[in-house]
Amino acid sequence: MIKFKLILIFFLFIVSTTYASVARPFDFRKWNFKKDIDLAYVLMHDLDNGILIKSQDKAGSIKSQEVLTKLNALNAYCNNLQRIIKAKLVRGRFQKEVELPLLKIIRKYKYLTRNYKNKSLIENPEYTKLIAERIIKKALFLENYFQSNRLKNVKSGENIKKRISDNQSKLKSLRSKPNKSVGSKFSKNSRPSKSPQGVKKCNKRRILDKYDLNGAESEFLDDPSQESDELEREYQDDELESEDPDDGEREYQDDRESRDDTFNEDQSEDEFFDSLEDQFI
């Protein structure tokens, strides 16, 4: 019983630490960070004969530590979300859907803060506001992506490779099967059609009697079905020769090549984002 309790406590501890790593540190959507930064700056300084000096009051340092603690917690929250999303996505998709939008946010605020000479937090309130705004936008983007359906429908790289190999094996099995449908199709439908009803049949016996050709009848009509059977066989052979049995094979080969091309396009896209990552890092 004691062992069971220890195992249960250990399991709950692991679950709590796992979910705590992605839990919101505070409601940053409603945080009026500009007001807190201005208040911390005012409390940290006093006016002495028109000169701004640092205050000896501890209220300013307490307020500034509160602002810095929130910024650090929010930054850690962003890093945890980014790590979890990266573990669930393949490399190319993570770079395309997550890293590049984050790089745009970082570049924007890097451009806005480029002219500030004093880059000390709280000491320069305007610079601190831009840094806080950048971290909040980054957290909002990662949080929205983490909660979106795009992350729920992600397939791992192993499943993708397995699906590709299954499709290739199916194509190979289809190519190896003989095309039996061609022979069966023409064996059923290759018989000569019946004569139309509007045409009168020729009375061959009367014509032979008229021209005294009864003796030659046996010569021409020994096997009346032999010539028709030979013609039917020749017709079937001609039709089978005209039908290309490799059409199905070419169709499956074209389909396979198109899938390979798609797959090659995805690989080149990964190489493109790899080069972008090398430029930005």
Swiss-Prot record:
Residues 250-262 have a biased composition (Basic and acidic residues). Keywords: Cell outer membrane, Membrane, Plasmid. It is a peripheral membrane protein. It is found in: Cell outer membrane. Its main location: membrane. Residues 162-281 are annotated as: Disordered. Residues 219-249, 263-281 have a biased composition (Acidic residues). Residues 179-196 have a biased composition (Polar residues). GO terms for cellular component: cell outer membrane. This is Putative outer membrane protein BBA52. It comes from Borreliella burgdorferi (strain ATCC 35210 / DSM 4680 / CIP 102532 / B31) (Borrelia burgdorferi). The lineage of its organism: Bacteria, Pseudomonadati, Spirochaetota, Spirochaetia, Spirochaetales.
